[in-house]
Amino acid sequence: MNTKHYDLIVLGFGKAGKTLAAKFGSMGKAVAMIEENPLMYGGTCINIACIPTKTMIVAASKGLSYDQVLNQREVVTSRLRNKNFGMLDTNEHVDVYTGHGEFISNKEIDVTAGEDKIVLSGDTIIINTGAVAIKPNIDGIDTASDFYNSTEIQHLSPQPSTLGIIGAGPIGLEFASLYAKLGTKVTVFNIESSILKREEPIVQELANEYLTEQGITILNDVTLNSVSNDGNKPVITANGQNYTFDAVLYATGRKPNTVNIGLENTDITTNERGAIVVNDTCESSVPGVYAVGDVNGGPQFTYISLDDFRIVFGALTGNGQYTLKDRKNIPYTTFLTPPLARIGLTEEDAINKGYTVKTKEMLVATMPRAHVNDYLKGAFKIVVNADNDLILGATLYSQGAEELINLIKMAMDNNIPYTYFKNQIFTHPTMAENLNDLCNF
């Protein structure tokens, strides 16, 4: 069997892995990149998650037809996928293997592409295999048809007239909002007492109101009895009642993708969720083997994968001062209509942790730029430590929230008191200037 040795092997073409491959390739190191699926060059974000779904949301907001939305998705993902492949393929020090990679020992990976096989060995190995959708544990889910995960539904054609969504987390609600924009009648099945249970009460209330205004039916406190088919239609049985749709999306979370990569042939340790256990530099239980991105069980965001790159690159080049224990204040955005951005603690979280807090809420309808935009939906809230005026958390639910939340993060990271925003000079009319009023208390 053919064999080849590399300085660095990357298993999985994700954000952290591809960036490490490009960096070390540019330094003259011999690098191998292994990716099983040519439609995944570049990783989850640009192919099946952040980029395609947000592209679809923007396209739908412009009034494009369903087929046009799908086409725009393909145009954008193809462009970025080809760019990412070219970034490595044109590097003379990087070999890209399109095939299935599986460990056969701690530092050897067998790569299979059809009838072709090769064993690659490496001084350093990076595991960047991402995460996969979790299929819900519901009676009938393994045999019923027309039930889709968040990847599969992005290719669904023709457009369903009715769509059931199992799960009311960020993925489920983003797709609910998207399909409602496109004219599909959407029903969301939520096992909790309300949607967005981790968010501030004002957000839960407003989001429920806005989603309902979009024509979305939200069923809370449901017990999912089973799923089945009535002819060629998928059926959800919940609380003893049957609901029939053209298609059903299950959005019940994602888990680390560590199956079928040969970890049983190594000394690499995984936890109860299947995530690879790592230390503060993302190194696994095998020295020289690192796990980055979703596969190590951290927050499932592409910017966290990029941060893993920073940590591993520093560790491998002798500048490992920044580690996982230094990471803090991770913001996130759920792309509802309007977008919902959060960082840090809610008021309830902060009180439960023993903080004495002071807070302020503002409705977007009171903000000048919102009137210019003719879009008055949403609210801001900030939670402050009353003992030292440092920001504990913030929620921004508005147009532009996905951008503004990063200002809050920088203040939190640098221990800047909330009063800094009260006295800051912002341009006018902007959404950012409302941080003056939000922090004036």
Segment roles from a protein language model:
Residues N2-G14, Q159-G169:
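Beta1/beta-strand and adjacent pyrophosphate-binding region of the FAD-binding site
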Residues T3-K4, T44-S121, E199-N225, E347-D349, ...:
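N-terminal Rossmann-like dinucleotide/flavin-binding domain of flavoprotein oxidoreductases
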Residues L11-L39, T44-I46, I51, M56, ...:
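Flexible, glycine-rich terminal cap/loop adjacent to redox cofactors
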Residues G14-T19, M40, C45, A133, ...:
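Residue-level detector of alpha-helix initiation sites
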Residues G42, V75-F85, Q154-H155, P160-G164, ...:
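Rossmann-like dinucleotide-binding cores of NAD(P)H-dependent redox enzymes
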Residues C50, T129-F189, T217-I218, E264-T281, ...:
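Glycine-rich dinucleotide-binding loop and its adjacent helix/turn
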Residues D95-Y97, E102-E115, L120, G183-D280:
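A Rossmann-like FAD-binding core segment of flavoenzymes
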Residues T143-P158, N242-N319:
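FAD-site-proximal beta/loop scaffold in flavoenzymes
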